[in-house]
Amino acid sequence: MPWIQLKLNTTGANAEELSDALMEAGAVSITFQDTHDTPVFEPLPGETRLWGDTDVIGLFDAETDMKDVVAILEQHPLLGAGFAHKIEQLEDKDWEREWMDNFHPMRFGERLWICPSWRDIPDENAVNVMLDPGLAFGTGTHPTTSLCLQWLDGLDLNGKTVIDFGCGSGILAIAALKLGAAKAIGVDIDPQAIQASRDNAERNGVSDRLELYLPKDQPDAMKADVVVANILAGPLRELAPLISVLPVEGGLLGLSGILASQAESVCDAYAELFTLDPVVEKEEWCRITGRKK
């Protein structure tokens, strides 16, 4: 069915209150959108982190009388009469199908392909990871995931143990297993990520070699030959004492989810225990790798 969208601009501080106002006026869903394409860094647990200049978008049933909606919103103290807004009709689409149609197989490095589970494999002789991301982060399309996949593809993982810290969809752990790792361990704070990783591991026939944990359940003595963490700069800095003990002596570390402008501060958090390689950048993001001293 078609929908009507009402968009208004506000500050991040007022976005939640105006979201409530739109819902009270009859919106069936609310979306927050950055007005200026500004990066948003990691929120605190339970916090919705918003941009300084935020578009609040309400979605309404096509039969809604938007004059009535606007009249209700004009009564809100943050808006008032004649408040700036934009109303447009959205065409009827199968949004999930459109997303699926735009997700294609992607190659990383020399051997590795990430393939949507609903697509044909482009190269039967390659290392193919069949992926359905579900609600978890990690499809290979983001520069940070791409940087990590390229790094893993260039390693000799045969017989190695790999930890994927912040595993999301499981893409990095599963890729490592398909590239020859004997065992992988995925850790994530989100139960949906654990389930997505489990489903994708089964789809790729590697579930017997993948262990998955919420942080509260992970083994105390967890160690690996290779540790990869594609999260964000803040957690990477804060969790450096925890992440640094995961690689064995001489083990490898790969970090991403880091803006290039944040690389120096993340490197500083790991330089004492690791011999770090030159930072690799892609678009505005980067990857930091090193070897445990």
From Swiss-Prot:
Domain of life: Bacteria
Annotated binding of S-adenosyl-L-methionine, by residue: T145, G166, D188, N230
GO molecular function, one term: protein-lysine N-methyltransferase activity
Catalytic activity from the UniProt record: L-lysyl-[protein] + 3 S-adenosyl-L-methionine = N(6),N(6),N(6)-trimethyl-L-lysyl-[protein] + 3 S-adenosyl-L-homocysteine + 3 H(+)
GO CC annotation, single: cytosol
Compartment(s): Cytoplasm
SUPFAM superfamilies: S-adenosyl-L-methionine-dependent methyltransferases
Keyword set includes Cytoplasm: yes
Entry's Gene Ontology BP terms: methylation
Keywords for this protein: Cytoplasm, Methyltransferase, S-adenosyl-L-methionine, Transferase
Keyword Ribosomal protein set for record: no
The enzyme's E.C. designation: 2.1.1.-
Disulfide bridge map: none
Signal peptide limits: none
Cross-referenced PANTHER family: ELECTRON TRANSFER FLAVOPROTEIN BETA SUBUNIT LYSINE METHYLTRANSFERASE
HAMAP family linked: Methyltr_PrmA
Task performed by this protein: Methylates ribosomal protein L11.
Family: Belongs to the methyltransferase superfamily. PrmA family.
Protein's UniProt name: Ribosomal protein L11 methyltransferase
Species of the source: Salmonella arizonae (strain ATCC BAA-731 / CDC346-86 / RSK2980)
Phylogenetic placement of the source organism: Bacteria, Pseudomonadati, Pseudomonadota, Gammaproteobacteria, Enterobacterales
